[in-house]
Curated annotation (Swiss-Prot):
This is Small ribosomal subunit protein uS12. NCBIfam families: rpsL_bact. The keyword tRNA-binding applies. It comes from Bartonella tribocorum (strain CIP 105476 / IBS 506). The gene is rpsL. InterPro entries: NA-bd_OB-fold (IPR012340), Ribosomal_uS12 (IPR006032), Ribosomal_uS12_bac (IPR005679).
């Protein structure tokens, strides 16, 4: 524990709070247009082809968003809505695309956690 004199010489510095989703600019979601839809591979030790899209947002930011769920209909010039939320094993992917909104269709044949994937209630 430092003495009073030590604290006068070198005061305590609060850690800098860094924004994890700067492109949202304090908004819950942002709209954007897909400029490129592609797959990428995750970091070790995982192995897959993860579906991602490069998105030009309405505020001019260009970000990479993850496309959750099985199968999607996105292509270049699709209009999408993104939310915050990183993908731990994909470096640089800090946003998720919201399914079932704008040009993004919901996941077909989804029975559980439907609201997260924009799937309607099955009859």
């Amino acid at each position: 524990m430092p003495t009073v004199n030590q604290l006068i010489r070198k005061p305590r510095v609060a850690p800098v709070k860094r924004n994890k989703v700067p492109a949202l600019q304090s908004n819950p979601q942002k709209r954007g247009v897909c400029t490129r839809v592609y797959t990428t591979t995750p970091k070790k030790p995982n192995s897959a082809l993860r579906k991602v899209a490069k998105i030009r947002l309405t505020n001019g930011f260009e970000v990479i968003g993850y496309i959750p769920g099985e199968g999607h209909n996105l292509q270049e010039h699709s209009v999408v809505m993104i939310r915050g939320g990183r993908v731990k094993d994909l470096p640089g992917v800090r946003y998720h695309i919201i399914r079932g909104l704008l040009d993004t269709q919901g996941v077909k044949n989804r029975k559980q956690r439907r609201s997260k994937y924009g799937a309607k209630r099955p009859k």
